């Protein structure tokens, strides 16, 4: 059994506080950008375009992530407190919302440059698990998105929450949705179907959705929502939607290769 009493503030500079959660976004985006350019992108022209594309990705993550949280997780509150939507520093981001934002911005960027949007989405899918890893570690440090009660020897007591030992669900997600998924995608990049733009994006959606869907059974539901349908959380319902889309996309691209 372990105790979590981490300070969510990484360091302070003058009067500014730099929080682990904000730094996780910065580390994730920088690591993804470096990996994409050095390992996953072979075409020099695409490498040049990718520098501009990163700006679109950042906007997609921030705008989509925030709007996703507002719409999917706390709509009633934000309808009554409209200006709170813009206070991102108070927390409240949705991975699925950020994912939708990235998809929209990728399509926009690709059309602007007359490219196939799936080419960009496959690159992002290949490095996204690194960002997910950093994000879930930050969730753990912040004592948020914590798990249900457990008697297992690796249970964690989140001192900022209560005296109960809980599943470190953030660490489960960091491992499965982050590290393991990263290596799964590297494996599938070698498949012949990976030559078809969109195949890797589908693989990412499938495995991310499966991992998160089952881990959420060990995670406390969002306090303001609880369980939404048949003891399923909002995150699990969104995972089912993305799993269906990812399966369709993967099969479509696989059949095309055949």
Q: What are these regions, as identified by a protein language model?
A:
Residues 1-258:
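A feature for loop-to-transmembrane-helix boundaries and adjacent hydrophobic helices
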């Amino acid at each position: 059994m372990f105790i979590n009493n981490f300070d969510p503030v990484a360091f302070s500079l003058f009067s500014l506080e730099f929080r682990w959660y904000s730094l996780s976004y910065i580390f994730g985006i920088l690591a993804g950008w470096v990996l994409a350019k050095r390992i996953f992108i072979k075409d020099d022209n695409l490498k040049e375009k990718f520098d501009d594309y990163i700006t679109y990705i950042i906007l997609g993550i921030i705008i989509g992530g925030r709007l996703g949280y507002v719409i999917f997780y706390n709509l009633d509150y934000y309808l009554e407190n409209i200006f709170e939507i813009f206070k991102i520093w108070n927390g409240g981001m949705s991975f699925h919302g950020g994912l939708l934002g990235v998809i929209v911005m990728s399509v926009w960027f690709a059309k602007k440059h007359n490219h196939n949007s799936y080419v960009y989405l496959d690159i992002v899918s290949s490095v996204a698990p690194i960002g997910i890893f950093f994000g879930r570690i930050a969730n753990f440090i912040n004592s948020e998105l914590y798990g249900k009660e457990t008697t297992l020897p690796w249970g964690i007591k989140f001192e900022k929450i209560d005296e109960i030992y809980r599943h470190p669900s953030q660490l489960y997600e960091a491992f499965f949705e982050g590290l393991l998924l990263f290596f799964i995608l590297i494996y599938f990049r070698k498949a012949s179907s990976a030559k078809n733009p969109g195949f890797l994006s589908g693989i990412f959606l499938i495995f991310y959705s499966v991992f998160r869907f089952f881990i959420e059974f060990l995670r406390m539901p969002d306090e303001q929502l609880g369980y939404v349908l048949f003891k399923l959380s909002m995150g699990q319902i969104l995972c089912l939607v993305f799993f269906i889309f990812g399966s369709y996309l993967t099969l479509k691209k696989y059949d095309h290769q055949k």
